[in-house]
Amino acid sequence: MYRYLVAAVAAVALAALQLPTAALAQQPLIIKFSHVVSPDAPKGKAALFFKEVAEKYTNGKVKVEVYPNSSLYKDKEELEALQLGSVQLLAPSISKFGPLGVKEFDVFDLPFLMVDDARAHQMMASPMMADLNKRLEAKGVSPLAYWDNGAHVYTANKALLWPEDFRGLKMRIQGSKVLDAVARELGAIPQIMAFSELYQALQTGVVDGEDNVPSNILTQKFYEVQKHLTVSYHGRLTYALVTNKKFWDTLPADLREPLGRAVKETTDFFNATAEKDNADALERIKASGKIQFHNLDDAQKKAWVAKLMPVHKEMQSRFGKNFLDQIYKASGFIPPQS
């Protein structure tokens, strides 16, 4: 009897020891997705869409936690957090990759390079991106997709109709050498600043203006603290959906395949959402009556292009003429002849 009792106790103890392991195996994989914009912006909507489809396609084996509005990391902190493995998904603008040490991504900030949807999509689908992706992966960051968030417009506390209107203005930029050169060529004073700090900086006059896509200007309410908006379409905002390379490479196949499918569907969702939301945002901002709208006429547009083309020449020393020529060919951009 005693022998049977000991055996039973041992069996119960062994089962108890095995319970945490079994329970652990049932726990979903947590993926933290951090971003700096509103949940109502195209990127915010896409993050929530990804959460929905990723959890669905993995049958609950993955749980996606979305952190909007810089609630987990500010934009100048998040890439380092990704490299350290503290967060698994980000969608920063590709302007952030220059300071990371992949300067070639700054090329996409060249003025008037990708001003329309077709040209932008053509560029991001070109074979050139494979080489740039490898350079990013060497930093421990794996691009999963590129999201086109549309063309930039300017806001400021004075009307920006001609290049000389920028002279002396403090303009917020991202940390891109090209954007710095653009501001200086216009006679403005570039101010690198985190996205989360921009509203207050505009409100208090720390900076005089900024450029962004209409959906961000609407959802962050920049139009409430600026007097003028110029529909300039001088540049483009492209996001990269990126993950930690080691994290992605070590995912089991039964998770990587459905997550890859979720990425593709989310990319299609994002691009369609951004196009619609930016058009709607312009109308809503205009209807608010809180900011004065300006559309550039042909003469003004030509003056902007002529003023900013020297930035392309200046950046040949940074990127090399051959690389720039490849970018022009891939994007369909034809530099004006001087």
PLM region descriptions:
Residues 1-4:
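Positively charged n-region of N-terminal signal peptides that target proteins for export
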Residues 6, 10-15:
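Hydrophobic helical h-region of N-terminal Sec-dependent signal peptides
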Residues 14-23:
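C-terminal segment of classical bacterial N-terminal signal peptides
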Residues 122:
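Short beta-strand-centered segments that line the small-molecule binding cleft or hinge
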